[in-house]
Amino acid sequence: MPKVHVRKGDTVMVITGKDAGKKGKVVTVEPAKNRVIVEGVNIVKRHRKATPQMPQGGIVEKEAPIHSSNVMLFCNKCNKATRIQKKVLDNGNKERICKHCGETLS
């Protein structure tokens, strides 16, 4: 299974494709497919038939997954998309650090 560099809840910036430059929160991570779903990015329209849960039916807009290589973590301190550096603390915990400013990313 490929390793994905982002986690659910991270703020990311899309770096390529039709939504390049947009920021959003990661809603879902699919490590088996190496894809992520980002809030407000890669919106697609799906035609839905009426069901008991949705009696109206019609055209529904939703976020579609994008490849994880097309997003970068976004650092709020330096306000840039950034790569990360991993550091092991004395107690054994790992933390992710912004390559630009050295700030710890949650």
UniProtKB/Swiss-Prot annotation:
GO CC terms of this entry: ribonucleoprotein complex; ribosome
Keyword match Ribosomal protein: yes
UniProt xrefs under CDD domains: KOW_RPL26
The keyword Magnesium is annotated on this UniProt entry: no
Molecular-function annotations in GO: rRNA binding; structural constituent of ribosome
Gene3D superfamilies: 2.30.30.30
Pfam families: KOW, ribosomal_L24
Keywords, sorted A to Z: Ribonucleoprotein, Ribosomal protein, RNA-binding, rRNA-binding
InterPro entries from the UniProt entry: KOW, Rib_uL2_dom2, Ribosomal_uL24, Ribosomal_uL24_CS, Ribosomal_uL24_KOW, Translation_prot_SH3-like_sf
PROSITE patterns from the UniProt entry: RIBOSOMAL_L24
GO biological process: translation
Similarity section: Belongs to the universal ribosomal protein uL24 family.
Subunit structure: Part of the 50S ribosomal subunit.
Task of the protein: One of two assembly initiator proteins, it binds directly to the 5'-end of the 23S rRNA, where it nucleates assembly of the 50S subunit.
Family annotation (HAMAP family): Ribosomal_uL24_B
Protein name: Large ribosomal subunit protein uL24
Phylogenetic placement of the source organism: Bacteria, Bacillati, Bacillota, Clostridia, Eubacteriales
Gene: rplX
